[in-house]
Every structure is written in structure tokens, then in C-alpha cells.
């Protein structure tokens, strides 16, 4: 498969839509030649997360220093926590002849899309937005995680409604109503798109 290593794949969608599960299944497909660009965050580490595997966990001061040093391809702050993708992660993955996969929120995705558009490099992005079948199903998924209070769940749902409104900024939109079908559809999109020169 002929692949252009400067490509960048963005997988985005509201919290609770299943991005993490989809991403882990995509990464198991070695034919896609993709690797996850691990994000950095200042949020508290969940009990099952590992630093450098799930996220790079940074202090607020460390994160702000990296912002000042222009070390992020994108970053955002929501729910009082910073999230971002380090440029060094992208370069490292590309140096290994893989295509970076970014699983990020819509704010970060919009920032990257705008940046690439301004540089005339939009063709280097493959943007995929994951949609829930409904807001009610999204609420159920978030509640099942047992990591948020009711107030936090409601905040996430309001944010999700706003995020869904920007779905048309993404080249592809895929509804996650059946995990296997959703992953198969995304695999097909990636396989087709990364072969384009």
C-alpha cells in the first residue's frame, strides 16, 4: 500500500460516543499503518490509566510551559482541564512510517482543520466525526462509565449538542449505533483515503 506519511487522521465526536473503543479496535488493524498520537492532559488520572500510554499527564504549569514553547499542534481547555497533542508525538509516529491517529475533541479538531486550511494543506487531513444514534443513548453511555456526577453528565450532554452542530466541518461522519459496523466503515474510509496521493 502506498501511503503518504504526512497524512494525519482525526477521529472526533462528543464525550461518550465511543471514540476510545473505536480507536482501540482501529489500532488492532495492522494493515491501516496507523498509530495513536497520545494526548497530554492536566486532568486527574483515572484508576485504570497509565501515564505515557493513555495520556501524558502534566501539571497545569508544565502544560502552560509547553503552550508558551509552541509544542502543541492543538490544545484546548474544557471542564477546567487542559488537553493537547504534542507536535513531537506527530513527528515521532511519522518517523516510524506510520500515520498519526488523533482522537480529540471538536475544539482541538477545529483548530487543526483551521491551521491546515490556512497553510493550504487541508488535503493532508482525514477528518472523521463519530455521531451517537441519539442524545439519550449518549447519556446512557456516559452514565455507565460511573466517572461523572449528574452535574458533569449534564455539562457533557450540553457540550455534545454543541459539538454535533459542527459535524459538517469533518470530511466523514459515521454513526456509532453498531460498534462492528462503525469500525468497519471507518476502516474502509481510512484504507481508501490513505492511498490517495
UniProtKB/Swiss-Prot annotation:
What disulfide bonds does the UniProt entry report for this chain? none
**Localization terms from the record:** Cytoplasm
Q: Which Pfam families match?
A: Guanylate_kin
Listed InterPro entries: GK/Ca_channel_bsu (IPR008145), Guanylate_kin-like_dom (IPR008144), Guanylate_kinase (IPR017665), Guanylate_kinase_CS (IPR020590), P-loop_NTPase (IPR027417)
GO CC annotation, single: cytosol
Entry function = Essential for recycling GMP and indirectly, cGMP.
What family does the entry list?
Belongs to the guanylate kinase family.
Question: What protein is this chain from?
Answer: Guanylate kinase
Q: Which organism is it from?
A: Mesomycoplasma hyopneumoniae (strain 7448)
What gene is behind this protein? gmk
Amino acid at each position: 500500500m502506498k501511503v503518504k506519511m504526512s497524512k494525519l487522521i482525526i477521529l472526533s465526536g462528543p464525550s461518550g460516543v465511543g471514540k476510545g473503543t473505536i480507536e482501540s479496535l482501529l489500532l488492532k488493524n495492522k494493515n491501516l499503518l496507523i498509530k495513536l498520537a497520545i494526548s497530554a492532559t492536566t486532568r486527574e488520572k483515572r484508576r485504570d490509566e497509565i501515564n505515557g500510554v493513555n495520556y501524558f499527564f502534566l501539571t497545569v504549569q508544565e502544560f502552560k510551559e509547553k503552550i508558551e514553547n509552541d509544542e502543541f499542534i492543538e490544545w484546548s481547555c474544557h471542564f477546567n482541564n487542559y488537553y493537547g497533542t504534542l507536535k513531537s508525538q506527530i513527528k515521532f509516529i511519522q518517523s516510524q512510517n506510520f500515520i498519526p491517529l488523533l482522537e480529540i475533541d471538536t475544539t482541538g479538531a477545529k483548530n487543526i482543520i483551521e491551521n491546515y486550511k490556512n497553510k493550504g494543506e487541508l488535503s493532508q487531513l482525514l477528518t472523521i466525526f463519530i455521531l451517537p444514534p441519539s442524545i439519550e443513548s449518549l447519556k446512557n453511555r456516559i452514565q455507565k462509565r460511573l466517572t461523572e456526577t449528574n452535574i458533569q453528565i449534564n455539562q457533557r450532554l450540553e457540550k455534545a449538542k454543541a459539538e454535533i452542530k459542527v459535524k459538517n466541518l469533518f470530511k466523514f461522519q459515521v454513526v456509532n449505533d453498531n460498534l462492528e459496523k462503525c469500525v468497519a466503515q471507518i476502516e474502509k474510509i481510512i484504507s481508501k483515503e490513505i492511498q490517495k496521493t
